[in-house]
Amino acid sequence: MTVQTKTKGLAWQEKPLSDNERLKTESNFLRGTILDDLKDPLTGGFKGDNFQLIRFHGMYEQDDRDIRAERAEAKLEPLKFMLLRCRLPGGIIKPSQWIELDKFARENSHYRSIRLTNRQTFQFHGVPKAKLQTMHRLLHKLGLDSIATAADMNRNVLCTSNPIESELHRQAYEYAKKISEHLLPRTRGYLDVWVDGKKVQSSDDFLQEDEPILGKTYLPRKFKTAVVIPPLNDVDCYGNDLDFVAVSDGNGQLAGFNVLAGGGLSMEHGNTKTYPNISLELGFVPPEHALKAAEAVVTTQRDFGNRSDRKNARTRYTIQNMGLDNFRAEVERRMGMPFEPIRPFKFTGRGDRIGWVKGIDGNWHLTLFIESGRLVDEGGKQLLTGVLEIAKIHKGDFRITANQNLIVANVAEADKAKIEELARTYGLIRNDVSKLRENAMSCVSFPTCPLAMAEAERVLPDFIGELDKIMAKHGTSDDYIVTRITGCPNGCGRAMLAEIGLVGKAVGRYNLHIGGDREGVRIPRLYKENITLPEILSELDDLIGKWAAGRDTDEGFGDFAIRTGIVKPVLDAPVDFWDASKAVPIARA
């Protein structure tokens, strides 16, 4: 490592460490005093460091914000409970597992629902503290866990839901699982607290523990990884810290991976030191070196990532601080080999194929559209029960997609009719879903997310309904615009890779971004700030009218907005995301 590289990448060391670094150092490898808090009947939540530590175990403490003021008036603490996010690399789950998870959701969660996420897993919302060990022991019995699905670790690893290319998908999925396992923390703290219920008696009990990859203070910030199979970019690969783009050998077999790093979509309103950015190309590696590449990127981020300012701690800021060439050189040094040149690849879209598709192996796959990923029995719909009934007879597997949908995968020809009958009976197959709605997404936001500034999941259905009317008015109902709503600027709804992105600013108010593309490779530009949903619809009515009248053949809304100068493209986010006047095209020889 050269002095120049080290100095450039580690300037943050001159400042005090964030308190999260103390917390991790003193946590006894993530155990803290969580077991003591579990025994405390006076509060539904966790105290002190434990409030943060449970995140490393895949949970967030939340409360029902709809009734927070009411409970405060009654001199009661907020109705506290936990969100749990399962670790499920590639989103594949067995029907037998689903049946048990459904039972837990109905009997033990406040909202009696299962939420499919755009990180290809499921979440329980509203789990009381008294049921947490029961929940984790159930996951353990089912061969599942929730370790490292939150906090400063490598989160759930995504993999393109591509059952048509069955062999290539199988190989890519195996690497998604291997990467997930390789980058897991080695501490027994998760098992000790949630499964065994064993309290560490002295420091001797954990002196033998080690974290050879993550280190005893783990990563500076969250770290997201995805495996993607072009031409489908369903996992939004440009929004992750680390991406493995599968390259086919031309015969349906895996030739290796293009490695990208430095994507991320969170920011802070008004803080120009924060910005979303797309991931950048490092190079190509053959399959046998994929784990080595993953470890090298993670340890480079571990050692160079900012541990003083958490708002500038993600991998994209590390690359910006070091410079891409220096970052790549450091990764290659740790790999012990250079990257090969990037192999050509291209994305053509990222939406799921709703309905039946046949794989090359002869099996059928039914993709069910699940709006915002929420499976619940309410409002005359029995979506949760519908999936349960399918699980009781399904002989294949389920695949949760990064678009918050559910694939009933590997269905034999003889079983198709019964599966479809159940799906239609319970409203899992609908004939009234527009292309616009199929390509819309939201985060959870109110009432459970403590960071929510504005509604997202609860307003999406009606907002898309109004947008559908505008599309019909301008004769574009057979087309779609990738539209996403997120309740705050932390990026969970991936609005910063949408053609139309709404980012919550305050209750009932949003920033409107436009100019992303259908393939998910361009960040949208801020168009209007701090406006209401009716105002947004009025703006979009005008813009969609212009798009309908002046678009080129097959030109998406975002591309049209850029071509016609409605907004300037975000070309280099660290430079021009906050200042469009600096969006100057890079001259190429």
UniProtKB/Swiss-Prot annotation:
Keywords: 4Fe-4S, Amino-acid biosynthesis, Cysteine biosynthesis, Heme, Iron, Iron-sulfur, Metal-binding, NADP, Oxidoreductase
InterPro entries: CysI (IPR011786), NiRdtase/SiRdtase_haem-b_fer (IPR005117), Nit/Sulf_reduc_fer-like_dom_sf (IPR036136), NO2/SO3_Rdtase_4Fe4S_dom (IPR006067), NO2/SO3_Rdtase_4Fe4S_prot (IPR045169), NO2/SO3_Rdtase_4Fe4S_sf (IPR045854), NO2/SO3_Rdtase_FeS/sirohaem_BS (IPR006066)
GO function terms (MF aspect): 4 iron, 4 sulfur cluster binding; heme binding; metal ion binding; NADP binding; sulfite reductase (ferredoxin) activity; sulfite reductase (NADPH) activity
Binding site for siroheme: 492
Catalytic function, reaction form: hydrogen sulfide + 3 NADP(+) + 3 H2O = sulfite + 3 NADPH + 4 H(+)
Cofactor(s) named in the record: siroheme; [4Fe-4S] cluster
Pathway noted in the entry: Sulfur metabolism; hydrogen sulfide biosynthesis; hydrogen sulfide from sulfite (NADPH route): step 1/1
GO cellular component, one term: sulfite reductase complex (NADPH)
Pfam family, one: NIR_SIR
EC number: 1.8.1.2
Annotated binding of [4Fe-4S] cluster, by residue: 443, 449, 488, 492
GO BP terms: cysteine biosynthetic process; hydrogen sulfide biosynthetic process; sulfate assimilation
Co-factor note (free text): Binds 1 siroheme per subunit.
Biological role: Component of the sulfite reductase complex that catalyzes the 6-electron reduction of sulfite to sulfide. This is one of several activities required for the biosynthesis of L-cysteine from sulfate.
NCBIfam families: CysI, PRK13504.1
Family: Belongs to the nitrite and sulfite reductase 4Fe-4S domain family.
Subunit-structure text: Alpha(8)-beta(8). The alpha component is a flavoprotein, the beta component is a hemoprotein.
Official protein name in the record: Sulfite reductase [NADPH] hemoprotein beta-component
Organism: Neisseria meningitidis serogroup C / serotype 2a (strain ATCC 700532 / DSM 15464 / FAM18)
Gene: cysI
